[in-house]
Amino acid sequence: MTAMKDIYIDKVVVHMGVGESGERLVKAEDLVKQITGQKPVRTIAKRTQPAFGIRKGAPIGCKVTLRRENAEKFITTALDIIERRLAPSQFDRTGNVSFGIEEHTDFPGMSYDPTIGIYGMDVNVVLEYKGARIARRSVERRKLPADQKVNKEEAIAFMCENYRVEV
């Protein structure tokens, strides 16, 4: 296998959707900061949903993007929480992996606090080959050839080999 065919974790996005702004969102931001060690950014509603009481442009969640060592460390901890089991449906055709963690109290060092409650989160892992930057760079941007994109089977093999995940 050539160096350009080595798969690596580009980023890990940790998202906590609260569905409303206010005190619950502030608590969620504090939890994400404690768990990941980074300050989260707020996510806003793309459209109005009257059934849920959500207005377009209102903050309804928070997320953190982890890269390099922080991403590696977090993904190891998160996979331990879900007992290193993933379903094939959690991999998409472009090699991304997504799974949920039901309770923040499953993380080491976190305990239940009745004033905060229990929050769940989504974890999205983006896998890429080296050289994928040509599709995102600002100077001399190029399209990525199909064989230079990670597919579902390669993503499953990468996670099984490097993180001992059962699929």
Curated annotation (Swiss-Prot):
Listed GO CC annotations: ribonucleoprotein complex; ribosome
Q: Name one Pfam family in it.
A: Ribosomal_L5_C
Leader sequence range is none
- Superkingdom, according to UniProt? Archaea
Which cysteines in this chain are paired by disulphide bridges?
Answer: none
Annotated GO biological processes are: translation
A single Gene Ontology molecular function, please?
Answer: tRNA binding
> What does the record give as the function of this protein?
This is one of the proteins that bind and probably mediate the attachment of the 5S RNA into the large ribosomal subunit, where it forms part of the central protuberance. In the 70S ribosome it contacts protein S13 of the 30S subunit (bridge B1b), connecting the 2 subunits; this bridge is implicated in subunit movement. May contact the P site tRNA; the 5S rRNA and some of its associated proteins might help stabilize positioning of ribosome-bound tRNAs.
Q: Which NCBIfam families match?
A: PRK04219.1
Q: Which family does it belong to?
A: Belongs to the universal ribosomal protein uL5 family.
**PANTHER family from the entry?**
60S RIBOSOMAL PROTEIN L11-RELATED
Please give the subunit comment from the record.
Part of the 50S ribosomal subunit; contacts the 5S rRNA and probably tRNA. Forms a bridge to the 30S subunit in the 70S ribosome.
Name of the protein this chain belongs to:
Large ribosomal subunit protein uL5
Origin species:
Methanoculleus marisnigri (strain ATCC 35101 / DSM 1498 / JR1)
Tell me the lineage of the source organism: Archaea, Methanobacteriati, Methanobacteriota, Stenosarchaea group, Methanomicrobia
